[in-house]
């Protein structure tokens, strides 16, 4: 997978990317732009979002993805600027340190993670689908996680539950709207070498080591590798891929024992 793809599968299409200011979102904005898409960068961090939009020659819309009115305005801005909403990569999310074992995680921490990781995906799908229905075509990619498929001994209870919700919602929407030309898939990355992961594991190196040893490929993913998967799901190359949990996890979910 390359950061500078020669294929241009998305020429003329409009892609809305939430959490576009950093990590997977930024890498995906770059990749989709390289493949010819118009990019609408959404982020609550104005400086990071503007930088992403400038780099990808796209549009920045400052967005709190937990606010229904701001989410509606985001997709309206995409349509007003470029004339269509073809791709929605609903990716914004958090993984705060106070989300831990169920025994230690407070209700406010639980609610905050659910709002950002799950409710935001609901709001973004709800806003994007009407545009895609009118067009008769569209691809929605929602960021879930490999932990939506597997239990984790190093628990982040609200994060895991939120990503399980994203997985189930994506499956249902993919089935519901398939005959209207809309595909909905859940992207399930393994641990990715992003600022979010580095911040989390810097505070707990032992936790990082425990994660790393279980990855058959022996390393964390790079954000551009996840972006390549998003580009595939956004493109017509995945025209028969729908309502799936699309795993990009380096083999974690397929490993019965830890590789030597």
Regions found by a protein language model. Name each.
Residues 2-7, 99, 231, 242-260:
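Short C-terminal tail/terminal secondary-structure segment
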Residues 46-47, 63-74, 107, 224-225:
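The beta1-alpha1 cofactor-binding region of Rossmann-like NAD(H)/NADP(H)-dependent oxidoreductases
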Residues 99-102, 106-111, 211:
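Substrate-binding pocket helix/loop in short-chain dehydrogenase/reductase
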Residues 125, 162, 170:
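Active-site helix of classical SDR
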Residues 130, 175-179, 239:
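Alpha-helical segment proximal to the catalytic Tyr-Lys
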Residues 145:
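Residue(s) in the substrate-gating loop at a strand-loop-helix junction
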Residues 182-183, 219-248, 253:
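C-terminal substrate-recognition "lid" of short-chain dehydrogenase/reductases
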């Amino acid at each position: 997978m390359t950061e500078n793809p020669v294929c241009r599968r998305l020429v003329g299409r409009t892609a809305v990317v939430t959490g576009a200011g950093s990590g997977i979102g930024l890498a995906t904005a770059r990749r989709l732009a390289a493949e010819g898409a118009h990019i609408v960068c959404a982020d609550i961090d104005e400086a990071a979002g503007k930088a992403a939009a400038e780099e990808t020659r796209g549009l920045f819309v400052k967005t709190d993805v937990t606010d229904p009115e701001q989410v509606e305005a985001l997709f309206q801005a995409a349509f007003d600027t470029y004339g269509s909403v073809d791709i929605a990569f609903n990716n914004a999310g958090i993984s705060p340190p106070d989300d831990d074992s169920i025994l230690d995680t407070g209700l406010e921490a639980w609610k905050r993670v659910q709002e950002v990781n799950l409710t935001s995906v609901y709001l973004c799908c709800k806003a994007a689908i009407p545009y895609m229905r009118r067009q008769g075509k569209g691809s929605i990619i929602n960021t879930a996680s490999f932990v939506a498929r597997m239990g984790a001994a190093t628990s982040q209870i609200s994060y895991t539950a939120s990503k399980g919700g994203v997985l189930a919602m994506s499956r249902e929407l993919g089935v519901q709207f398939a005959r209207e030309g809309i595909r909905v898939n859940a992207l399930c990355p393994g641990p990715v070498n992003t600022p979010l992961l580095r911040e989390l594991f810097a505070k707990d190196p032992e936790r990082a080591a425990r994660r790393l040893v279980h990855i058959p490929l022996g390393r964390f993913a790079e954000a551009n590798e996840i972006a390549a998967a998003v580009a595939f799901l956004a493109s017509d190359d995945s025209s028969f891929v729908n309502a799936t949990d699309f795993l990009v996890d380096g083999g974690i979910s397929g490993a019965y024992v830890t590789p030597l």
